[in-house]
């Protein structure tokens, strides 16, 4: 990143590691082309994100970044200003890079919430919601659900007990939701309370340990599983839930809706219904070929 990008073209991108399977460039570049927007979206694969790296992006004319694993919590700390979700939950998946300041946003929660409302709104009413994992995605999702007014109870199950407790404390402090950290062993004994399972860890992702996070007999036909892993769509966890008759929300839906919000933040143009339909079709086709 030694030279500035073409300044007549607005340049955005994604930062994370690894990124070889990311579909974000397909999403953003396709909409730019559809809308005749003079912009490009690049891939910046890096294991380190710090102040110096942000300055490199700024010097190169990069105006905005999608942030993914493992940098979401780091991204928040590098921003000068942040939206409520980022500020409260201490994780961001979007950075806008201005001449002098960096702004952090979190569109993960909004993306997940839209997906749930579209595919399984009843799952927010009939029982408790459990989030599996306590990383950057889990933080954004937990906050958006907590402030939605749609749930009263939230469980967070993570192998990292410290971050699970932190998420629950932040949710309880900043909403009317009762949030409770829970171990996997205890969760297995309380499965009848659960209506919605949201899986946010890398387990099942291509190139990662397959999992599943929960055994097959955890699920039943009254549950909904939302595994935010989208490559592959049918993870071992999804297959286990399907076998038990649970409803499935595709992980690609969160990718779709969080990207639509990022597109709006990057371009100041609101996505329309046609953008969503076309993007969903492109994602489906791309995932079929993987």
UniProtKB/Swiss-Prot annotation:
Superkingdom is: Bacteria
Gene3D superfamilies cross-referenced by the UniProt entry:
Leucine Dehydrogenase, chain A, domain 1, NAD(P)-binding Rossmann-like Domain
Ordered alphabetically, the record's keywords are: Amino-acid biosynthesis, Aromatic amino acid biosynthesis, NADP, Oxidoreductase
Biological process GO terms, please? Answer: amino acid biosynthetic process; aromatic amino acid family biosynthetic process; chorismate biosynthetic process; shikimate metabolic process
Describe which pathway this protein belongs to, using the record's wording: Metabolic intermediate biosynthesis; chorismate biosynthesis; chorismate from D-erythrose 4-phosphate and phosphoenolpyruvate: step 4/7
Residues of the signal peptide: none
MF terms per GO, please?
A: NADP binding; shikimate 3-dehydrogenase (NADP+) activity
Q: Where along this sequence does the record place binding of shikimate? A: 22-24, 68, 93, 108, 230
What the entry lists under CDD domains is as follows:
NAD_bind_Shikimate_DH
- Which reaction is recorded as catalysed by this protein? shikimate + NADP(+) = 3-dehydroshikimate + NADPH + H(+)
Q: Where is the active site?
A: 72 (proton acceptor)
EC no. given is 1.1.1.25
* Cross-referenced PANTHER family: BIFUNCTIONAL 3-DEHYDROQUINATE DEHYDRATASE_SHIKIMATE DEHYDROGENASE, CHLOROPLASTIC (PTHR21089:SF1), SHIKIMATE DEHYDROGENASE (PTHR21089)
Protein name, as recorded: Shikimate dehydrogenase (NADP(+))
Q: Which organism is it from?
A: Leptospira interrogans serogroup Icterohaemorrhagiae serovar copenhageni (strain Fiocruz L1-130)
- Which gene specifies this protein's sequence? aroE
């Amino acid at each position: 990143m030694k030279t500035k990008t073409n300044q007549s073209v607005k340049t955005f991108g994604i930062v994370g590691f690894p990124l070889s399977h990311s579909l974000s460039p397909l999403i953003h570049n396709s909409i730019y082309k559809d809308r005749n927007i003079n912009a490009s979206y690049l891939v910046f694969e890096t294991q380190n994100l710090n102040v110096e790296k942000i300055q490199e992006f700024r010097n190169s004319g990069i105006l905005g970044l999608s942030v993914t694993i493992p940098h979401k919590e780091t991204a928040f700390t590098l921003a000068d200003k942040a939206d409520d979700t980022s500020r409260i939950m201490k994780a961001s998946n979007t950075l806008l890079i201005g001449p002098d300041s960096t702004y952090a946003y979190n569109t993960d929660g909004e993306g997940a919430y839209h997906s749930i409302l579209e595919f399984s709104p009843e799952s927010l009413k009939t029982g408790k919601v459990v989030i599996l994992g306590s990383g950057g995605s889990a933080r954004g999702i937990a906050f958006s659900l907590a402030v939605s007014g749609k749930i009263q109870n939230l469980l967070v199950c993570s192998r990292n007990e410290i971050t699970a407790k932190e998420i629950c404390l932040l949710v309880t402090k900043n909403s009317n939701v009762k949030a409770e950290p829970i171990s996997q062993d205890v969760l297995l004994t309380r499965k009848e309370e659960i209506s919605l399972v949201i899986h946010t860890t890398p387990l099942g992702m291509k190139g990662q340990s397959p999992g599943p996070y929960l055994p097959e007999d955890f699920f039943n036909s009254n549950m909904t599983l939302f595994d935010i892993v989208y490559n592959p769509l049918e993870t071992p966890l999804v297959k286990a839930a399907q076998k038990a008759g649970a409803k499935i929300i595709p992980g690609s839906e969160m990718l779709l809706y969080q990207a639509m919000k990022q597109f709006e933040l990057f371009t100041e143009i609101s996505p329309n219904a046609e953008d969503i339909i076309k993007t969903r079709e492109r994602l489906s086709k791309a995932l079929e070929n993987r």
